[in-house]
Structure formats: structure tokens, C-alpha cells
Amino acid sequence: MLTVALTAASVMPMTVYAQPAFASGGEVKVVEGDVNGEMQGGVMSPGAMAIEGSDLKVNGNVSGGLVSDGSTVTVNGNVTGNGIDTVIAKKGTVTVNGTVTATDLSEKTGVLASNGSNLTVGDTEVGGKESTGVIAESGSKATAGNVKVSGEYMTGTSAYGDSTVHVKGNVTADGNGMTGVSVHDGDKSSLIVDGDVTATGENSVGIYGETGIIKIGGDVSGREAVITKGKADVTVGGSVSGTLVGIVAGGNAAVSVKGDAGTKTGAGMFAQENATVTVDGNVTGGTFYGELEDFEDVYPAIIAGTGATVIVKGTVSTAEGNGVAVGINCKDIGSQKGTLIIEKAKAGGEASAIYVDTIPGVSQEYILNSLPDIVVGELAAKNENFIWNSYDNDLYQNNPEDETIGELNEKIYAAIRYMIRWNNSEGGSFSVDGTSKYGEYDVAQENQELGITIQIAEGYELESISGGKAQVLQRPDGTWSVIVPRGGGVNLSAVLRRIIKEEMKNSRVSNPGASGSEEQTTVQKSSGYVEFQKAVRSQIKNAAPGAVLEVDGKNWMSFDRSTMEELSKRNDLTVVVRFRYLGKRWRVVVPDGYAVQTLLNQEGYSGFLYLSAVFGAVPEEA
């Protein structure tokens, strides 16, 4: 006979259960059905509670919250609470395979992991005031689905004391004085949100970071979208959008935004003290808060202190009106020399691209020495008034008295480093003499002459060379040169034409819309040709950024105007076209960044043979 000895730690299954579920003394208990909290001795006990190393499982819903103190609690259902800390793990492990709903909280927490706990819940919704949806503290880890809080002065989720919070969905905070996510203490604290962080209402903040690491996979929005200080390290995988300000970074904080950053009113970015802010996309400023609609001045897109590091890989621009792209605040002095690296700074209206707000009572030499290193690709402003400053003898009583605003402008111009850019290709490569390196950038300064040599590959010939905003001059020895203009914009490019076989050079198809097996004298807009163009346009629209797009021309011999217009919107794409001609398969490559609409003929077509003449065609096996 088989005998089984039962101990106090054995599994104790229960049936339909409405009263609180409780486990203690190391017991293992399984409760089938819903459980509710109840008043015991004038105190509301939670719906589920495990202490003293116990293991409690509830296969149902829990009303009245749950507590794990040094124990394990699993709920295969939903958890609700009213006016209480609804899910609490203290030195324990909690798993809720359902939702958590907490209502009418006041200075409470919907989900709390503390003292080294490990807590996992599903979607969490919390309402009330001065409360938080999900908190991890004192070395704990909390994982949740979507987190939504509503009410007044609520926070979606927070991490304290070297703890980790991971939200696998979105964080939404809706109400007055709301904060989406925050990290307050613990250099090793981390807060990760896979989706978006959205804070709406008056005085709302999307991200507030004082230390630790914050990583957001999607977009961040709020009245003030991102506020950081201390040693906070923030990464946003999407874009940042504020209604009052996009980013405020101070202390030694670091903020990295993979998309754009901007605001409706105020500055798109404040970079203060020793902060570092990197934006891979564009930065835009807004209007002045509360001004009349016809007020012509707008806020600078960026305001940076002299010790901050700002890197923008896109364009910095303002709202419509008179607005400075970048304002440098010389009164905001960090403990280090700052850096300002911007692809393009574009002023609004009558303003300058860069404005330097100087310090009263100091010399121009002092101001110049305090400025950050300025590295730009291009400055854009009306009438080429790219730089302006507030240096005014009468107002600031600067010394010496004979120094003027205009003189300081010229000294700032002389200190700017301009990015010098060029693209090499299969047909040839540039060699540029006279540049220097600033980090990853090749740079030169105003009025500096640069020597240019092009190494042309065998089978190619040079058709033309351009310097962007710089004029290219040919030297007697066959090389070229450019002089860096004020405002930069030096972008070297060359059109290299492949010398193709005689059979291609001498061949001609009079109908760009005809198939490769038949020449016609009139354009046949057949349904097959129309469908081919439609399919190519769809490829272009859906291509990943920077992709190499493979187009099978089948038996067609051209692109129409609509297709080329669509391609002109995607100058990041390289297009490889394969087509059949004279019994052979050919391949022609249209490089990224090319002005493709110039390849259209008068009838609005771009024939593959013409593309071959411009870019060169390579035969392939039939």
C-alpha cells in the first residue's frame, strides 16, 4: 500500500472562497475562486495575504488588495483595491496574471515592490491624488503591462534606491500636475518603458529624472516633456513633444532622443550646467507663452549654457516668426567647456541663427573664452545675418568702451568650425586637403581654402562637381578648390558617368513605356505599365530608412513622373533597377541623394537606358 505523509507545508487546496485568503508559517495554499478583504478588529484585511515564507495561489479575482511579506503570492485573475496600497510585495515575490485597478488613492501606491522584492502584474490603472501607479524601491524589481493614472498630482511609475521598473506597454498620466515616469534616487536605479509616455493636463511632466537610467522605447509628451538633473541618463527611442518645453537638462544629466524634439510654446530644449543632450532628428521651438496671436517674435529652439554639450543631427528651427535657432546663455556657466554640434541652424523671420547672450561688465575676450566649441554644417538666416549678440556698452558698461557688437560678431564667426561633407561612390572618391578633425567630423573655418582631388574609377568619367553653398574652382593642375563661405553649407558632390558598352550607348528606345521586347513610337499607358508604376511607388513609400531598394523592371523600360516624384521624397534610398534590353539583363544603380526629377524627359518619363547613360549599366546573366 502506498502511503503519503502530509506536512504543514503541504499543498492545501480550497474550494469556492469569498473570505480573505491567508497563508503563514511556510504553508503552501491554493485557493479556487474569488476572494475579498474584510474588516477584522476594525481594520480592513487584504483579500490575499502571505507571510513567513508561505506560498499562496489564488485562481480567481482578489478584492481588497494583496500583501506578500517574505512570501510568494500568485493570482490568476484581477486585483482591485479602494483607497489602499493595492498590491504590496515586501521581501517577497508577487505575480498577478491579470489587471490591477486601484481607486480613490490618497498618498498611496497601486503596486509597490520593496526590500528586494520581485513583482509582476498586468495592466495597471490607478486613480486618486498624490499617488503612484507602480513603484520599485530598495533593490526591488517591478514589471507591469500598460500603466495608467488619473486624478491630481499622480505619477505613473517611479524607481527608488537602486531598483528597476519595467513597463512592457505605455504609461499614461491624465490630470492636473501629473508625471509620467520618474527616478529619484539610486545611481543604479533603472526605469524602462517599451512604449510611449504621455502626460496630459496642466503642469504635466513626461519624464522626471534625478539619477539612474530611464529608457523609453516610444514617444514622450507632456507640458514639459523631459526634465532631468543630477546624473540622470535618459534615452528616448521616439520623439519628444512638449506644450511648454521639450527638454530641460541640467546638472550632469545626459539625454538622448532618437527622433525629433519640439514644443508648441517655449524652447524646444534647455541645456544647462554640464548636461549633454543628443537629438538624432530635428529640434523646433515654439511661440512665447500667453502672447497675442499677432506677436511676431518666437522662442529660440535651443537655449544652451556655456558648459553644456548639445548635438543635433538634424535641423534646428523655430516656429513661424522672428526666432533665434540657438541661444547661448553666457550667464549659465558649467564646470567644463561645452560643445555645440548642429547639422543645420535655421533662423525664423528677421532673427539670427545663433544669438549670444553676454555677461555684463566683462571683456569680449572673456566671452569668447567662455563660449562652447561651435561646430555646424550650415547656418541659415535672412540676409545672411547668422550671428548676433547682446554686447552693449551703454547697457552693460562693458570695458574697453570701443568694443562693439559687430566686432564681437566677427570674432564669433572666426571661432566657428564648419562641417565639410562629401560622399564617395563606386565611380570615384574625394580627397580633401585642409580640413581638421573635430570628433567624427571633418571641419574647416570661414575663408579657409580647401584642395579637392577626385580619384575616378576605371570606366567612369566626371560630368560635374558641386560644392553646395561653396563655389568650386578648377586649378591649372586639374584639381579643384573651395573657399569655406560664411554660414558653411559645404557639401561636395560629383556626377560620375559610367562609360558603358557601345551597344548600350548607340541603342535607343523611342517609347519609355514600352516593353523591352518591342519598340513603339507612342506611349502606351497600358494597365500593366500603370500597375508596375503603382507597385514601385508602394515599394518606395514602405522602404526602411537608408535602404537599398531592388526594383525588377520586368519588361518595362521606364519610370513615370509620379514614380520619380515619390522617389524624390526619399533621398535616403539607393535604387537598383534591373531590366531587359537587347536580349540581356542589365542593372543600373540610382544613388541616394540624387535629384531624380532632373532625370525626367519632356514627356514625363525617365527611361532605363537614359539612367544607364547617366549612372552606368552592368550586364547580368540572362
Where are these regions (language model features)?
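Glycine-rich repeat segments that build the extracellular carbohydrate-interaction surface of secreted
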Residues: 29-31, 51, 60, 451-454, ...
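Surface-exposed interfaces of beta-sheet-rich extracellular modules
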Residues: 372-391, 395, 448-480
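Bacterial Sec-dependent N-terminal signal peptides
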Residues: 1-5
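Sec-dependent signal peptide cleavage junction
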Residues: 10-25
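Extracellular/surface-exposed low-complexity segments
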Residues: 19-23, 314-316, 322, 330, ...
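Surface-exposed loop/turn motifs in large extracellular/passenger domains
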Residues: 22-37, 46-61, 66-83, 87-131, ...
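Extracellular modular ligand-binding repeats in secreted and cell-surface proteins
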Residues: 367, 372-374, 431-461, 486-488
